[in-house]
Amino acid sequence: MKKRIPQCLLLVAVMIISGIPTFAQRKSAMLNHIALYVYNLEKSTAFYRDIIQIDTIPEPFHDGRHTWFKVAEHSHLHIISGAKEIVTHDKNSHLCFSVPSVEEFMTRLRQHHIPFESWKGEADKPTLRVDGVKQIYFTDPDGYWVEINDDHT
């Protein structure tokens, strides 16, 4: 046990000196997850897995009411079943995913008969933001708006 204490102290010192990030060093909040309350878990899971193409990750509940997706290194999307109905949402409240090619993504949406639009609501057209980023908008099975863009920053 006495040999372990110096080893642990040495490890902590090396981490501090080398600048390896730790929770104590983080100065701001970090997004952990976003949760969406959905009407049909299977349909929503298939949408985010097969259309958006994000990977599922293990969830701790194992109760048939949750699906978790990894959306970034330390950020997740949680889909939770139990909504009594599908609700209309405003486009200003949306999730956004960046992809290598908006054109290829539009082709996928067309193949799956999922309508999309520009920010102004023009059907089957992308928007070109003032900074050159191309973007489209559509809704998931529960009426949540999703933006797809080609922002590479």
What are these regions (language model features)?
Residues M1-R26:
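Bacterial Sec-dependent N-terminal signal peptides
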Residues F23-E42, S93-L95:
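N-terminal beta-strand motif that seeds the catalytic metal site of vicinal oxygen chelate
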Residues A35-H76:
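Core segments of cupin and vicinal oxygen chelate
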Residues N40-E42, L95-D142:
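Vicinal oxygen chelate
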Residues D63, K91, G132-V133:
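Exposed loop/turn and edge beta-strand positions of beta-sandwich/beta-sheet ligand-binding modules
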Residues H66-Q111:
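Mid-chain, structured segments of secreted extracytoplasmic proteins
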Residues H152-T153:
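A short acidic/small-residue loop/turn micro-motif
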